[in-house]
Protein backbone atom coordinates (compact mmCIF):
# COMPACT_ATOMS: atom_id res chain seq x y z
CA UNK A 1 0.00 0.00 0.00
CA UNK A 2 3.02 2.29 -0.36
CA UNK A 3 3.70 4.58 -3.28
CA UNK A 4 6.80 6.57 -4.16
CA UNK A 5 6.23 10.02 -5.65
CA UNK A 6 8.84 12.54 -6.73
CA UNK A 7 7.85 16.21 -6.67
CA UNK A 8 9.97 19.12 -7.91
CA UNK A 9 9.35 21.67 -5.18
CA UNK A 10 10.98 24.38 -7.28
CA UNK A 11 8.10 24.14 -9.73
CA UNK A 12 4.50 25.24 -9.29
CA UNK A 13 3.36 21.79 -10.39
CA UNK A 14 5.41 20.09 -7.69
CA UNK A 15 4.08 22.34 -4.95
CA UNK A 16 0.53 21.79 -6.19
CA UNK A 17 1.10 18.03 -6.09
CA UNK A 18 2.19 18.18 -2.45
CA UNK A 19 -0.87 20.23 -1.60
CA UNK A 20 -3.13 17.63 -3.19
CA UNK A 21 -1.42 14.86 -1.26
CA UNK A 22 -1.67 16.78 2.02
CA UNK A 23 -5.43 17.09 1.60
CA UNK A 24 -5.76 13.33 2.13
CA UNK A 25 -2.69 12.66 4.30
CA UNK A 26 -2.49 11.92 8.00
CA UNK A 27 1.17 12.91 8.46
CA UNK A 28 3.73 15.12 6.72
CA UNK A 29 7.40 14.82 7.71
CA UNK A 30 10.00 17.28 6.43
CA UNK A 31 13.69 17.76 7.10
CA UNK A 32 14.54 21.11 5.52
CA UNK A 33 16.21 23.95 7.37
CA UNK A 34 13.79 26.29 9.16
CA UNK A 35 12.06 28.68 6.77
CA UNK A 36 12.42 26.60 3.59
CA UNK A 37 8.93 25.10 3.70
CA UNK A 38 7.44 28.55 4.37
CA UNK A 39 9.18 29.94 1.28
CA UNK A 40 7.67 27.09 -0.71
CA UNK A 41 4.22 27.79 0.69
CA UNK A 42 4.19 24.36 2.34
CA UNK A 43 4.66 25.29 6.01
CA UNK A 44 2.46 24.16 8.87
CA UNK A 45 0.19 27.21 8.81
CA UNK A 46 -0.50 26.77 5.11
CA UNK A 47 -0.99 23.02 5.29
CA UNK A 48 -3.39 23.08 8.23
CA UNK A 49 -5.80 25.22 6.20
CA UNK A 50 -5.91 22.40 3.66
CA UNK A 51 -6.17 19.59 6.21
CA UNK A 52 -6.95 20.57 9.83
CA UNK A 53 -6.25 17.01 11.01
CA UNK A 54 -2.74 16.92 9.54
CA UNK A 55 0.19 15.94 11.77
CA UNK A 56 3.14 18.03 10.57
CA UNK A 57 6.59 17.01 11.83
CA UNK A 58 9.75 19.05 11.19
CA UNK A 59 13.07 17.32 11.90
CA UNK A 60 16.15 19.55 12.09
CA UNK A 61 19.48 19.54 13.86
CA UNK A 62 18.78 22.38 16.27
CA UNK A 63 15.08 23.22 16.12
CA UNK A 64 13.04 25.94 14.44
CA UNK A 65 14.49 28.89 16.37
CA UNK A 66 17.52 29.79 18.42
CA UNK A 67 21.11 30.71 17.54
CA UNK A 68 21.93 27.38 15.83
CA UNK A 69 18.69 26.85 13.95
CA UNK A 70 20.07 27.76 10.52
CA UNK A 71 23.16 25.56 10.78
CA UNK A 72 23.47 22.36 8.80
CA UNK A 73 24.83 19.32 10.57
CA UNK A 74 25.13 15.57 10.86
CA UNK A 75 24.83 12.98 13.62
CA UNK A 76 28.42 13.58 14.78
CA UNK A 77 27.74 17.30 15.32
CA UNK A 78 24.59 16.63 17.30
CA UNK A 79 26.34 14.04 19.46
CA UNK A 80 29.01 16.60 20.33
CA UNK A 81 26.49 19.26 21.32
CA UNK A 82 24.63 16.67 23.40
CA UNK A 83 27.80 15.65 25.25
CA UNK A 84 27.72 12.08 23.95
CA UNK A 85 30.95 12.17 21.95
CA UNK A 86 32.82 13.53 24.95
CA UNK A 87 32.02 10.31 26.78
CA UNK A 88 33.38 8.07 24.01
CA UNK A 89 36.92 9.14 23.21
CA UNK A 90 39.77 7.40 21.42
CA UNK A 91 43.26 6.92 22.82
CA UNK A 92 44.43 10.47 22.10
CA UNK A 93 41.38 11.93 23.90
CA UNK A 94 39.60 13.00 20.73
CA UNK A 95 35.79 12.87 21.02
CA UNK A 96 34.49 10.19 18.72
CA UNK A 97 31.19 8.98 17.38
CA UNK A 98 29.96 5.46 17.96
CA UNK A 99 29.07 3.16 15.08
CA UNK A 100 25.38 3.72 15.81
CA UNK A 101 24.14 7.18 14.71
CA UNK A 102 22.33 7.71 17.98
CA UNK A 103 21.39 11.36 17.36
CA UNK A 104 19.91 10.57 13.95
CA UNK A 105 18.10 7.40 14.99
CA UNK A 106 17.32 8.03 18.65
CA UNK A 107 17.17 11.81 18.65
CA UNK A 108 15.55 12.15 15.23
CA UNK A 109 13.70 9.10 13.95
CA UNK A 110 12.58 7.52 17.22
CA UNK A 111 11.62 10.78 18.92
CA UNK A 112 9.67 11.83 15.82
CA UNK A 113 7.86 8.50 15.65
CA UNK A 114 6.78 8.74 19.29
CA UNK A 115 5.57 12.32 18.83
CA UNK A 116 3.71 11.48 15.63
CA UNK A 117 1.97 8.48 17.19
CA UNK A 118 0.88 10.54 20.19
CA UNK A 119 -0.40 13.28 17.89
CA UNK A 120 -2.35 10.76 15.80
CA UNK A 121 -4.10 9.46 18.90
CA UNK A 122 -4.97 13.03 19.87
CA UNK A 123 -6.23 13.79 16.35
CA UNK A 124 -8.58 10.81 16.50
CA UNK A 125 -10.12 12.24 19.65
CA UNK A 126 -10.02 15.97 18.96
CA UNK A 127 -10.14 16.16 15.18
CA UNK A 128 -7.22 18.59 15.27
CA UNK A 129 -3.73 18.17 13.89
CA UNK A 130 -0.46 19.03 15.59
CA UNK A 131 2.86 20.62 14.72
CA UNK A 132 5.87 18.65 16.02
CA UNK A 133 9.27 20.35 16.21
CA UNK A 134 12.08 17.80 16.57
CA UNK A 135 15.63 19.04 17.25
CA UNK A 136 18.02 16.10 17.02
CA UNK A 137 20.65 17.72 19.25
CA UNK A 138 18.08 18.41 21.97
CA UNK A 139 16.60 14.92 21.82
CA UNK A 140 20.08 13.35 21.86
CA UNK A 141 20.92 15.33 25.00
CA UNK A 142 17.77 13.95 26.64
CA UNK A 143 19.10 10.45 25.90
CA UNK A 144 22.42 11.30 27.59
CA UNK A 145 20.78 10.96 30.97
CA UNK A 146 23.60 9.11 32.75
CA UNK A 147 26.15 11.86 32.14
CA UNK A 148 23.64 14.55 33.03
CA UNK A 149 22.73 12.85 36.30
CA UNK A 150 26.42 12.38 37.15
CA UNK A 151 27.01 16.08 36.59
CA UNK A 152 24.11 16.93 38.89
CA UNK A 153 25.28 14.48 41.56
CA UNK A 154 29.00 15.27 41.56
CA UNK A 155 29.08 18.87 40.38
CA UNK A 156 31.15 18.39 37.24
CA UNK A 157 31.45 16.58 33.96
CA UNK A 158 32.58 12.96 34.37
CA UNK A 159 35.83 12.13 32.61
CA UNK A 160 35.55 9.75 29.65
CA UNK A 161 35.40 6.20 30.93
CA UNK A 162 34.55 7.38 34.44
CA UNK A 163 30.80 7.76 34.24
CA UNK A 164 28.72 5.11 35.98
CA UNK A 165 27.76 3.56 32.63
CA UNK A 166 31.05 4.01 30.76
CA UNK A 167 33.58 2.30 33.03
CA UNK A 168 33.43 4.28 36.24
CA UNK A 169 32.31 1.31 38.33
CA UNK A 170 33.99 -2.09 38.81
CA UNK A 171 30.60 -3.81 38.57
CA UNK A 172 29.78 -2.24 35.19
CA UNK A 173 32.92 -2.48 33.12
CA UNK A 174 34.87 -4.45 30.54
CA UNK A 175 38.02 -6.43 31.25
CA UNK A 176 40.78 -7.86 29.06
CA UNK A 177 41.05 -11.59 29.70
CA UNK A 178 44.10 -13.83 29.83
CA UNK A 179 43.18 -15.47 26.50
CA UNK A 180 43.20 -12.16 24.62
CA UNK A 181 39.46 -11.58 24.62
CA UNK A 182 37.23 -9.24 26.62
CA UNK A 183 34.74 -9.89 29.38
CA UNK A 184 31.89 -7.42 29.83
CA UNK A 185 30.44 -7.27 33.33
CA UNK A 186 27.06 -5.60 33.83
CA UNK A 187 26.29 -6.60 37.40
CA UNK A 188 24.89 -3.48 39.02
CA UNK A 189 22.57 -5.39 41.34
CA UNK A 190 24.34 -6.79 44.43
CA UNK A 191 23.21 -10.37 43.84
CA UNK A 192 24.70 -10.44 40.35
CA UNK A 193 27.94 -8.80 41.45
CA UNK A 194 28.25 -11.26 44.30
CA UNK A 195 27.74 -14.18 41.90
CA UNK A 196 30.40 -12.79 39.57
CA UNK A 197 32.96 -12.34 42.34
CA UNK A 198 32.37 -15.89 43.53
CA UNK A 199 32.69 -17.21 39.96
CA UNK A 200 36.12 -15.58 39.50
CA UNK A 201 37.16 -16.72 42.97
CA UNK A 202 37.41 -13.19 44.38
CA UNK A 203 34.72 -13.04 47.08
CA UNK A 204 36.84 -10.40 48.80
CA UNK A 205 35.77 -7.96 46.06
CA UNK A 206 32.06 -8.27 46.78
CA UNK A 207 32.00 -4.98 48.77
CA UNK A 208 33.97 -3.21 46.02
CA UNK A 209 31.45 -3.19 43.16
CA UNK A 210 30.50 0.47 43.54
CA UNK A 211 33.94 1.82 44.45
CA UNK A 212 34.84 5.06 42.70
CA UNK A 213 38.00 7.12 42.29
CA UNK A 214 41.29 5.51 43.40
CA UNK A 215 39.42 2.66 45.11
CA UNK A 216 37.72 1.93 41.81
CA UNK A 217 41.10 1.71 40.06
CA UNK A 218 42.38 -0.80 42.60
CA UNK A 219 39.25 -2.94 42.34
CA UNK A 220 39.33 -2.89 38.53
CA UNK A 221 42.99 -3.93 38.55
CA UNK A 222 42.23 -6.81 40.93
CA UNK A 223 39.42 -8.08 38.72
CA UNK A 224 41.53 -7.73 35.58
CA UNK A 225 44.23 -9.86 37.18
CA UNK A 226 41.66 -12.55 37.94
CA UNK A 227 40.19 -12.96 34.46
What are these regions (language model features)?
Residues 28, 119, 226:
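Short alpha-helical functional segments enriched in proximate histidine and acidic residues
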Residues 6-7, 32, 108, 160, ...:
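A generic structural signal for short
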Residues 25-28, 54, 127, 203:
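Secondary-structure boundary/capping positions in well-ordered alpha/beta enzyme cores
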Residues 1-49:
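A structured beta-alpha segment of the ubiquitous adenosine-cofactor-binding alpha/beta core
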Residues 170-227:
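Aromatic-enriched alpha-helical interface/lid elements that frame and gate functional surfaces
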Residues 38-188, 195:
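Active-site-adjacent "lid/gating" segments in soluble enzymes
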